[in-house]
Amino acid sequence: MESTWYLYILRCRDGTLYTGITIDVEKRFEAHCSGKGAKYTRGRGPLELVYRETCQNHSQALKREWEIKAMSREKKQELIENNG
């Protein structure tokens, strides 16, 4: 059986949003905060975890990540405010 995957959104110090997927949100967040996460988030801290969503598998998580990355900033904000 495949592990549960999570989609997450971080808010960076400069107000930008970073979307990613992982099987362990807390561990991945720590990696981002310590500069070992995505290149995009390095130097943009402090970071805030503002949204997480459970996905059934890796494939679903990738699909959802693509959907959210295609959203406008306004739509991402609505998602965070309504569900974050």
Task: Show the residue positions of the predicted features.
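GIY-YIG nuclease catalytic motif and its immediate N-terminal context
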Residues: 1-84
